[in-house]
């Protein structure tokens, strides 16, 4: 994880 996880979580929440 890391910074990538931050974006993935935000996108997943929107999806």
UniProtKB/Swiss-Prot annotation:
One of its GO terms (cellular component) is cytoplasm. The keyword ATP-binding does not apply. It is found in: Cytoplasm. Its main location: cytoplasm. D-glucose 6-phosphate binds at residue 11. GO terms for molecular function: glucose-6-phosphate dehydrogenase activity. Its EC number is 1.1.1.49. The keyword Transferase does not apply. Keywords: Carbohydrate metabolism, Cytoplasm, Glucose metabolism, NADP, Oxidoreductase. NADP(+) binds at residue 9. One of its GO terms (biological process) is pentose-phosphate shunt. It comes from the Eukaryota. Pathway: Carbohydrate degradation; pentose phosphate pathway; D-ribulose 5-phosphate from D-glucose 6-phosphate (oxidative stage): step 1/3. Belongs to the glucose-6-phosphate dehydrogenase family. Catalyzes the rate-limiting step of the oxidative pentose-phosphate pathway, which represents a route for the dissimilation of carbohydrates besides glycolysis. The main function of this enzyme is to provide reducing power (NADPH) and pentose phosphates for fatty acid and nucleic acid synthesis. Homodimer. This is Glucose-6-phosphate 1-dehydrogenase, cytoplasmic isoform. It comes from Zea mays. The lineage of its organism: Eukaryota, Viridiplantae, Streptophyta, Embryophyta, Tracheophyta.
